[in-house]
């Protein structure tokens, strides 16, 4: 494994960010420290992947995806394909690596970083806070896509989960629903937490109570998808945190003798996986293409020396009204 910025930082007692600034000629590092870093880098044979002569050329961008989110028929597989297309249009090359649970627990760096094969990183999908911090400490231009870690200084591009879930909840209220539940483990990802907040804010705005027994988990805290036990008294509607869990939940309700949408209405989020023959879902469509373009643009700007404070870019979507809601 080659020498990393983190290795240099450990030797000198500074952060990988300081190493990155020193080697790229950025401000924020004393001249004495800059020279110490340069000397140590030369001594250890460190090779900087973001040298000036590469700034106007296409980059090799690593795409790190938690393994549990990725398969050929998932939302993130579609996201990944769109990322590759945007990268190709901009002269960049994308390299995928799946991050399994053991790597996150043991804080094992991805092979793409250990082999120094990439110039920048896009993190697609929620990583643990400790693992995201480890990645950020490596000093490469990095953007989180479809999640964010508030305590880690890192650019993030996310959909407008709060607004989208609020719009879906409002549609149910406008249809006469007053007893509304939520499907999603709010501790599992930042997106689910924000969608719950959007749902809860709209319920509060309309002076409607939320029954705790009707806030159902769709997965474990480790993101293993599960089907929840149903409450004895069902609400008349559910806001589901995403389409991928909404569909099996509908089948779960039907298996219990519940008609959808006649007995229980369903709204969801993402506008993904509307298979022919299945119930057309009322959902909030995420503009994944815009999110990919912004993420690639942001990581490119960072690689070219943008030193603005980390930002969180929120991308809007639109409500798509279909057949999964019945009026009360």
Where in the sequence are the language-model features?
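N-terminal helix-turn-helix DNA-binding module of bacterial transcription factors
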Residues: 1-57
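Alpha-helical recognition/docking segments in bacterial nutrient-uptake
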Residues: 58-170, 228-233, 237
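Hydrophobic alpha-helical segments within soluble ligand-binding/sensing domains
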Residues: 157-182, 220-227, 246, 286-304
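An alpha-beta-alpha
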Residues: 168-207, 311-326
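Short beta-strand elements in bilobed, periplasmic/extracellular small-molecule ligand-binding domains
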Residues: 87-99, 196, 200-221
């Amino acid at each position: 494994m080659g020498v990393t910025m983190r290795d240099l930082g450990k030797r000198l007692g500074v952060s990988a960010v300081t190493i990155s600034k020193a080697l790229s000629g950025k401000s924020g590092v004393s001249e004495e420290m800059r020279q110490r870093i340069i000397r140590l880098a030369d001594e250890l044979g460190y090779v900087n992947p973001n040298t000036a002569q590469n700034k106007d050329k296409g980059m090799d961008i690593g795409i790190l995806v938690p393994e549990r989110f990725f398969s050929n028929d998932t939302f993130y597989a579609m996201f990944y394909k769109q990322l590759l297309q945007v990268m190709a249009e901009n002269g960049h090359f994308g390299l995928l690596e799946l991050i399994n649970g053991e790597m996150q627990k043991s804080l094992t760096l991805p092979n793409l970083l250990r082999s120094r094969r990439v110039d920048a990183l896009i993190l697609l999908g929620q990583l643990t806070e400790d693992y995201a911090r480890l990645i950020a400490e490596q000093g490469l231009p990095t953007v989180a896509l479809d999640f964010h870690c508030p305590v880690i200084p890192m650019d993030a591009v996310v959909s407008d989960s709060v607004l989208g879930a609020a719009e879906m909840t409002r549609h149910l209220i406008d249809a006469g629903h007053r007893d509304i539940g939520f499907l999603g483990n709010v501790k599992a990802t930042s997106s689910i937490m924000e969608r719950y907040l959007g749902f809860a804010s709209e319920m509060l705005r309309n002076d409607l109570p939320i029954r705790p027994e009707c806030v159902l988990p769709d997965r474990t805290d480790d993101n293993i998808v599960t089907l929840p036990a149903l409450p004895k008294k069902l609400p008349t509607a559910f806001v589901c945190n995403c389409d991928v869990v909404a569909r099996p939940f509908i089948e779960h309700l039907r298996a219990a003798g519940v008609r959808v949408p006649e007995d229980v209405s369903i709204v969801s989020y993402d506008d993904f996986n509307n298979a022919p023959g299945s119930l057309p879902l009322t959902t909030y469509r995420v503009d994944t293409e815009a999110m990919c373009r912004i993420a690639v643009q942001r990581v490119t700007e960072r690689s070219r020396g943008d030193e603005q404070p980390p930002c969180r870019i929120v991308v809007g979507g639109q409500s798509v009204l279909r057949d999964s809601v019945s009026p009360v």
